[in-house]
Regions:
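Acidic/His-rich, divalent-metal-binding segments that scaffold phosphate/diphosphate chemistry
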Residues: 2-104
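Divalent metal-dependent phosphate-bond-processing catalytic cores, especially two-metal-ion Mg2+/Mn2+ enzymes
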Residues: 5, 17-21, 44-48, 55, ...
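His-Asp-centered metal-binding catalytic motifs of divalent-metal-dependent phosphohydrolases/nucleases
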Residues: 70-88, 109, 113, 132-138, ...
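Helix-adjacent hinge/juxtasegments
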Residues: 89-131
Length: 211
């Protein structure tokens, strides 16, 4: 029987370690998000809303970027980690209040993820890259930032658009879709066009793209 190459053995150990620490961080994110008091139904079963959002983010990321880095996978899964702790209602219900809320959330989510990554052996460079992704720095200039933005937009259109559009004025929804479309890459837009949208939703998308 041929002996295992020592260098291959070291590489295998490193790969197992890297996989193990990623799984550990994702599990910690899931545990945190399972505390979300807001429940939604998944196949008739109540689950934590932000836990489900994290799973959907990871699902779309695996479709777009099968070889995504650990940092990108963590940023996708942790995009809304413990979001319910900073509700929109804590800020003025105007554009300035919305922007302040969003900026606060970016820092909050990054602050939640940093100790989880440190605990599992991720270095400062990886943590800072995570922060840049969560804080939406580098969209349109950095491939990972753009990939994450594509995933965010696709998850919104695939899972949350129907609920959103019936709660807001059509002109506002058209404007939101137009802005969402502009954030996506051509690849993301192509995937969006393949989504099985309801006729009313598709009509809004068509108006947004034609406007």
């Amino acid at each position: 029987m041929q002996a295992l190459d020592p260098s291959a053995s070291r590489e295998m150990r490193e790969l197992l370690f890297m996989s193990g620490r990623l799984d550990a961080v994702l599990a910690l994110i899931d545990t945190a998000n399972e505390e979300d008091p807001h429940q939604v139904l998944l196949d008739g079963i109540p689950v934590a809303s932000e836990w489900l959002y994290g799973q959907r983010m990871s699902g779309w990321l695996s479709r777009l970027e099968p070889e995504a880095s650990d940092v990108l996978k963590i940023a996708a899964r942790g995009q809304h980690v413990r979001r319910w702790m900073i509700p929109r209602s804590d800020y003025p219900m105007d554009r300035a209040g919305y922007l302040k809320w969003r900026t606060t959330l970016y820092r909050f989510h990054a602050d939640q993820l940093e100790p989880l990554m440190k605990a599992e052996g991720y270095g400062e460079a990886e943590i800072q890259r995570m922060r840049a992704l969560i804080e939406k720095r580098g969209i349109k200039t950095h491939p990972e930032a753009q990939a994450l933005e594509d995933v965010i937009c696709l998850v919104f259109l695939a899972f949350y658009f129907d609920h959103f559009r019936v709660r807001h004025d059509r002109s506002k929804v058209v404007d939101i879709v137009r802005k969402t479309w502009g954030k996506m890459s051509e690849r993301g837009q192509a995937h969006a066009l393949e989504l099985p949208l309801a006729p009313d939703a598709l009509s809004i998308v068509e108006d947004a793209l034609g406007g």
